């Protein structure tokens, strides 16, 4: 209905315009202005909104839009099939030397050897005796070189050496270890006396030894983590650590032990295990 009214008004406006033009063509003094001027004085307002038309056909498919943001991580999928075996990798480093194996079975007896010649041992005994004397003298000379010149002390199983470089406790541990030894551990009276005599005759007053309570306060152990169960030689009223900072041990030239602070620097004694022949 609204559309019909709009159409009717539009047709009436056109009829009026045509009538004016017709009167002008007849010379009648109706209005001397042009049709454009006449129309310009009339304001044509838009009509009311019409009814919705029928829905048009579906348009063509548009272009692909921009790629959206990455979505959240999905749920872990099922385990896939085992892949083909890969190439053989590089050989790894050589492992540590294993433990010594058990003694093997006794082998088959060998063939009987050829008969030996009769020995004229008289002259050889004299040579052997002279060699024994030479070896004894050589051992005495070697002991002199070790003790006096090189400054080494030894027992049947170990060598002991005073390192005349002032280092703190941890540096002393490292120094001995990188040279194949350990900070000296006097685990019995014999070794303790040997080291104390060594220190005194070298003209020193104190040295670091391999005893500490760095792991647990008050529980002193040797540097190989064995406890002081069988032997210790503390100075009277030692160990005493009221401030809790004296976690390392020094040996005095008297052979007595004293707990001291680990950051202090002094000479120290390394021990080395003798290689078995």
From Swiss-Prot:
Residues 1-27 form the signal peptide. It is found in: Secreted; Golgi apparatus; Cytoplasm. One of its GO terms (biological process) is heterophilic cell-cell adhesion via plasma membrane cell adhesion molecules. Residues 45-103 form the Collagen-like domain. One of its GO terms (molecular function) is chemoattractant activity. Glycans are attached at residues 11, 258. GO terms for cellular component: collagen trimer; cytosol; extracellular space; Golgi apparatus; nucleus. CDD domains: CLECT_collectin_like. Pfam families: Collagen, Lectin_C. Residues 49-67 have a biased composition (Basic and acidic residues). Disulfide bonds join 176-270, 248-262. It comes from the Eukaryota. Lectin that binds to various sugars: galactose > mannose = fucose > N-acetylglucosamine > N-acetylgalactosamine. Acts as a chemoattractant, probably involved in the regulation of cell migration. Belongs to the COLEC10/COLEC11 family. PANTHER family: C-TYPE LECTIN DOMAIN FAMILY 11 MEMBER A, TETRANECTIN-RELATED. This is Collectin-10. It comes from Mus musculus (Mouse). The lineage of its organism: Eukaryota, Metazoa, Chordata, Craniata, Vertebrata.
